[in-house]
């Protein structure tokens, strides 16, 4: 748990063939389990997004999996299977709103998305027939972290996230954190 993260971002969207957003990430290999609570965010657009993402690269058209909370459409699980390919599917869970816990788990090529009200009891993020499990061969290393987009290029939004926990965060003896988080503002 790294306290509360306040992330300001703009960007056109995380969708279609290329993404424009802010990404706070950790590079890692192998399986992982990442969770966080989306405390709040300023939804400047109905499709503003904040959530947990795994990407093959930092390129705008990278294959990725993204479980996210939207401005007014609730939680979505979306993915892009190929470089520069389409992003989908489109269904959302409209009853979800901040604060909400999101979780993204990788086991080999299987990515599973969850949501929770309390961070203890997790439900699969199966939304309107769209699966919570996505099989995607991203390889190693992958970039894992928090993605935020306002959905309006040039217009900032602010997201507050806490309770960030990841099984891939290596810790050195004596409590020194060996992981380095980075932020990237990707744009088309």
Language-model regions, residue ranges each:
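Extracellular glycan-recognition regions
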Residues: 1-182
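Residue-level hotspots within well-ordered secondary structure
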Residues: 187-188
């Amino acid at each position: 748990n790294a306290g509360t993260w306040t992330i300001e971002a703009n960007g056109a969207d995380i969708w279609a063939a290329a993404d424009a957003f802010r990404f706070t990430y950790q590079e890692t290999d192998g399986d992982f389990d990442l969770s966080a609570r989306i405390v709040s965010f300023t939804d400047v657009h109905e499709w503003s997004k904040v959530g947990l993402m795994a990407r093959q690269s930092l390129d705008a058209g990278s294959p990725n999996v993204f479980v996210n909370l939207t401005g007014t459409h609730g939680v979505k699980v979306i993915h892009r299977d190929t470089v520069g390919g389409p992003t989908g599917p489109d269904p959302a869970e409209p009853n979800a709103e901040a604060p909400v816990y999101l979780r993204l788990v990788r086991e080999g090529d299987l990515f599973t998305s969850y949501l929770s009200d309390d961070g203890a009891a997790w439900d699969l993020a199966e939304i309107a027939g769209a699966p919570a499990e996505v099989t995607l061969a991203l390889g190693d290393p992958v970039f894992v972290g928090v993605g935020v987009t306002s959905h309006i290029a040039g217009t900032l939004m602010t997201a507050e996230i806490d309770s960030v926990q990841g099984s891939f965060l290596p810790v050195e003896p004596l409590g020194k954190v060996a992981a380095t988080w980075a932020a990237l503002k990707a744009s088309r």
